[in-house]
A protein has these predicted regions:
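Active-site-proximal, Lys/Arg-enriched surface segment
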Residues: 1-43, 156-161
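Single, function-defining residue in the core of a domain
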Residues: 4-8, 39-235
């Protein structure tokens, strides 16, 4: 296959500019991987199992493809097991974020753009007539208090917020930064589950990052580190 003479070819953005250009002609696949917790002598480890790869042909958007893949897997999993969907900043949009409302046992931990709109929680009702406020005032990432735990490479902080990605739902925003004085170094992650409601036993984990981030009070960030396995699965 070369040039433009092959089926389902698209002009794709390549952030790494592997060929010296920000764009390349090629195929785009949406992939889904399941991390299965296993007991071992060292503690709980995770077996990464690729579940599917779907070629993007423009009949559906990549977000719709991803949502369909997750939906097909969720219908096969036991509803009594908590499932956490990990994804990068491309996927936290309506077709995918809406899955959390479709399945009671599904939560989501995702990286999002640092300019994603965040709101404070609404204040207590005043007793006046009228509809109660859906959310508080808009928040800037710089308003979230960041600390650098011992042994950490980043400053980090957490705050309960409301976002338009899940309207009316309280989620947890996690912020990391190499330098709190430089907004360009901020990264933003969102978790739909409260840390205490995440069904893992941190003290039994064999994954070093999960244990370390749990010690710092940032368990969702440790779990998000498992997402990298889907990147290396292509190699």
């Amino acid at each position: 296959k070369y040039g433009t003479k092959f089926q389902a070819r698209s002009n794709l953005f390549d952030h790494a500019a592997h060929n010296g250009s920000n764009y390349l002609k090629g195929h785009c696949f949406v992939s889904l991987m399941l991390h299965v917790p296993l007991k071992s002598a060292d503690g709980i480890t995770y077996l990464s199992v690729p579940l599917g790869y779907r070629l993007w042909t423009r009949e559906l958007s990549k977000l719709e493809l991803a949502a369909d893949m997750v939906r097909s897997v969720m219908t096969e999993l036991s509803s009594c097991r908590q499932v956490i969907l990990l994804c990068d900043s491309w996927y936290p949009k309506k077709p995918v974020t809406g899955l959390v409302s479709e399945f009671e046992n599904l939560e989501m931990i995702c990286c999002v753009r640092s300019d994603t709109v965040l709101y404070d929680l609404p204040g207590e009702r005043t007793g006046r007539r009228g509809r109660p406020r859906i959310h508080g005032s808009r928040l800037e990432l710089s308003s979230i208090i960041l600390n650098k735990p011992k042994g950490a490479s980043y400053y980090m902080g957490c705050r309960k917020v409301i976002t338009n990605l899940w309207k009316g739902r309280i989620v947890h925003a996690y912020v990391t930064a190499t330098d709190p004085g430089k907004p360009g170094s901020f990264r933003l992650f969102l978790c739909t589950a409260a840390p205490e409601d995440i069904a893992v036993e941190p003290e039994k984990q064999a994954e070093e990052k999960i244990c370390r981030y749990n010690t710092w009070g940032m368990l969702p960030l440790g779990l998000f580190s498992l997402r990298w396995n889907i990147e290396t699965s292509y190699y």
